[in-house]
Each structure stands twice: as structure tokens, then as C-alpha cells.
């Protein structure tokens, strides 16, 4: 046997689910995302009458502090190891983080509101600690802000629960709205870092570029939006901020040459998802002017941008960190197309009053299908060892 073959690494046998953060959290996020549609239907049908969180409040809470925070956890626990060269939780500590997240999903469907509040506020703090130690040990100051954002998310989810429990006098929805702005900021930061890079690496001659002024305006406008929501500014001010943000993010996307990525699914899904951020901001401006309801803008961000960006990143990082080629076949294309169609149906189909209920139902089914496909396709990828035999 030639030496080159004799010394090739062989994948280790056994369960690899707890080897690195992306593995359990991407799997949990996809399964939860697919089946949460059933839980939403059960709530809507009155089959969970004693659930602490009900209706649209549960729906929004679980989109942010169930699905989205799980993907953020998987991404950060993996990325921080790469950024710092230091260990992040694996094995039993990683399992404990996953159990804490699962407990939060269960408790909001029970009557135990105080316990649900404590657990859901604790998870972002635990995640901040998990990434904070390696970041600080490596003095990776560029990414310290993630620690702060996670602590802000913890404070916001706690505020929502305290409001619901009657401990503070603010609308429970305020914490969710501000948390959505924080998630938008995270997507804007990471999108600006990775989408141009992935575009130029994956599409020869794409020529994706960045402009310092556009970058500052794009990120600054999202911070302004957070402050506008926090202080409940006048509608004219909100209109100006959201229009400026839409223009800034639209210019940013144009610099990335999206039209050149059509033949590369692992790249175009990121561009398509980012386009929904621009749509979200434009629809928020229309809502501030009283021309549309606010839910259209919310779902452009949650279904289109968050759904598309997380699905694209979960696919890309799962393949890259398990030693697989960064390619996509019909399975991945179907997942990406389903979540984008779900967004279009939910946002634009719902604008016709007669089609609103049908658009909600159809988009929910399309969403569940997209993430169900991911769970089925990537179960073996996420639970088995790397193909190249490397750790992780």
C-alpha cells in the first residue's frame, strides 16, 4: 500500500455530537424549528391551555430565544475556538448548555413562569461565559462585543418575562422588539465580515467589495434603530432612520455583486437572506408612515433574513467543520428555496386580506419542510466524526 494512503487519517468511530458546539445546537435548532410549527398549531387549537407563554408572544419568544439563540450558540462556540485557538465547551459542559436550552423550550409551555424566566435569561449568560473565557485568554478584543450582546439579550428576555409576570410595568413585546434589533445587528456585523469573503472565495471574479463609509452607515443605522425602539421616538424620526438604514444596507448589498452568485447555492442563499434585511427596513419605514402593518416587516426579518442566513451558515459551517467539500446539491438547493419561498409567501401573500390565513399556513409548512430537510440531511453529518479524522 502506498505511504500516502497508509497514513491518511481515519474518522474515529462513535458519537461525535458533543465534540464541538455547532453539532448539538444546529441539530436542536433545526428539529425545534421544524416541529415548533406543530406546537404553534397546538396552541392555536387550544390544546395547551396552561402554557405560560401563549399565542404570538410564545411565537416571537421562541423564534428569538429558542431557534435563533441556538444557532448563535452553535456558531459562536465553534467560531471562538477558531478565532482564539483555545477550547470552548465540549463533552459534559456542552451537554449542560444544551440541556439548559431545552429546559427553556419546555418551561414556557408549562405554568411555571418564574422558572421559565430564570432559565431563559440564564442561557445567554452561560453562553457569554463559555465564549468569554477563551476570548479574554487570547485577548481577542475584536470579538469582545459578542459577550456584551449576549448579556443584553439576557437582560431583554428577562425584562419580557418580568413584564409578563407583572413585576415591571412595560409591554412584554418591548423586550422582544429590542432583542430582534440586537439579532439584526449581529447579522449585519457577521454578514459584513463573511458574505463578501465567501463570495470572492466561492465565485471566481465576483469582485465583492466593501466601502468604509457604507459599513459605518449600515451598522450605525441599526444601532440608531435599537435606540429609536428603546425610546419610542416619533414616527417621523423612525421613518427617517429606517429609510436611511434601508438605503445603507441596500448599497452594502450592491457592493457584494449578488447577481454573480446565482450559480453557487452556498453563496446566493446568504445574499438572498441579506436582501430580506433591506426589505425589512423598507417595510418598517412604510409601517412607520402608517401604510402597512408592522408584522410584514417583522416576518421579512425573521423568516427571510434570519431563516435564510442561519440555514445557509448552518449548512456551510457543518460541511466545513466536518471535513466535507463546500458544495451543495439538490437537497441543499431545496432547503434554501423553501425558506425563501416561505418568506415571500408570509410577507407578500399576507398583504391580501383574503389570503392572509392561507399565507400563514403555507409559509409555516414551507418553513417546517426546509428545516425538516436540514435535520434529516445533516443528522449523520452532525453526529458522526469528521471525514478527515481531525478533532472537532
What are these model-predicted stretches?
Residues 1-392:
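Hydrophobic alpha-helical transmembrane segments of multi-pass integral membrane proteins
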Amino acid at each position: 500500500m502506498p505511504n500516502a494512503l497508509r497514513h491518511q487519517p481515519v474518522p474515529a468511530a462513535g458519537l461525535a455530537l458533543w465534540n464541538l458546539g455547532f453539532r448539538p445546537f444546529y441539530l436542536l435548532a433545526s428539529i425545534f424549528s421544524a416541529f415548533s410549527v406543530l406546537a404553534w398549531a397546538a396552541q392555536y387549537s387550544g390544546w395547551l391551555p396552561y402554557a405560560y407563554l401563549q399565542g404570538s408572544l410564545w411565537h416571537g419568544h421562541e423564534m428569538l430565544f429558542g431557534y435563533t439563540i441556538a444557532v448563535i450558540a452553535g456558531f459562536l462556540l465553534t467560531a471562538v475556538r477558531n478565532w482564539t485557538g483555545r477550547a470552548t465547551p465540549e463533552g459534559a459542559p456542552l451537554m449542560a448548555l444544551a440541556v439548559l436550552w431545552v429546559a427553556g423550550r419546555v418551561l414556557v409551555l408549562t405554568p411555571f413562569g418564574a422558572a421559565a424566566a430564570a432559565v431563559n435569561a440564564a442561557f445567554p449568560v452561560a453562553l457569554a461565559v463559555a465564549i468569554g473565557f477563551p476570548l479574554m485568554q487570547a485577548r481577542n478584543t475584536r470579538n469582545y462585543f459578542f459577550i456584551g450582546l449576549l448579556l443584553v439579550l439576557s437582560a431583554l428576555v428577562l425584562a419580557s418575562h418580568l413584564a409578563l409576570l407583572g413585576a415591571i410595568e412595560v409591554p412584554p413585546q418591548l423586550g422582544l422588539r429590542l432583542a430582534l434589533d440586537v439579532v439584526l445587528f449581529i447579522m449585519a456585523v457577521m454578514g459584513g465580515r463573511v458574505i463578501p469573503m465567501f463570495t470572492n472565495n466561492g465565485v471566481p471574479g465576483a469582485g465583492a467589495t466593501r466601502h468604509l463609509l457604507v459599513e459605518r452607515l449600515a451598522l450605525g443605522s441599526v444601532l440608531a434603530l435599537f435606540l429609536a425602539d428603546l425610546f419610542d421616538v416619533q414616527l417621523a424620526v423612525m421613518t427617517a432612520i429606517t429609510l436611511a438604514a434601508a438605503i445603507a444596507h441596500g448599497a452594502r448589498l450592491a457592493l457584494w455583486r449578488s447577481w454573480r452568485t446565482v450559480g453557487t447555492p452556498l453563496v446566493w442563499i446568504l445574499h438572498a437572506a441579506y436582501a430580506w434585511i433591506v426589505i425589512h427596513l423598507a417595510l418598517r419605514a412604510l409601517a412607520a408612515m402608517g401604510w402597512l402593518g408592522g408584522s410584514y416587516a417583522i416576518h421579512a426579518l425573521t423568516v427571510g433574513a434570519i431563516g435564510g442566513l442561519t440555514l445557509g451558515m448552518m449548512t456551510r459551517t457543518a460541511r466545513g467543520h466536518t471535513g466535507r467539500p463546500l458544495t451543495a446539491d439538490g437537497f441543499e438547493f431545496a432547503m434554501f428555496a423553501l425558506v425563501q419561498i416561505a418568506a415571500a409567501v408570509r410577507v407578500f401573500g399576507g398583504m391580501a386580506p383574503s389570503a392572509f390565513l392561507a399565507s400563514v399556513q403555507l409559509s409555516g409548512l414551507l418553513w417546517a419542510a426546509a428545516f425538516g430537510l436540514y435535520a434529516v440531511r445533516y443528522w449523520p453529518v452532525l453526529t458522526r466524526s469528521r471525514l478527515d479524522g481531525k478533532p472537532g
